[in-house]
Amino acid sequence: AYAEVVEPVRIPLNNKEYIHHEDPFTTNPELPIGFNAYTGSGDVTAEVVYANYGRREDFQKLEAMGISVKGKIVLARYGGNFRGYKAKYAQAYGAAGLIIFTDPGDSGYAKGLV
């Protein structure tokens, strides 16, 4: 049997950091939620399109494949370029929103000892 989606599924994103008892700053309720300075705010409901690192060449590749981000939410990994460029390119290609996430394979312990 296959799942049939007949209406959009709304998923609120929790931007609060998880509490780590080893880090006292994560227990401070006064700390703000994460944000990307100088970007717009709003409530967006749209299809999500994965755009790798959100670099210009990633958007060009999507375009060459016939995939448009116009009116959609772009999902991009941190790294590869400055996060401000991810927003700039997403806006230039007509995206309605942008979510930037950390890929565990690109950071932290997966990279090995420093």
Feature names for model-found ranges:
Residues 1-70:
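Noncatalytic luminal/extracellular "stalk/propeptide" segments of secretory-pathway proteins
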Residues 51-114:
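A conserved hydrophobic secondary-structure block that centers on an alpha-helix together
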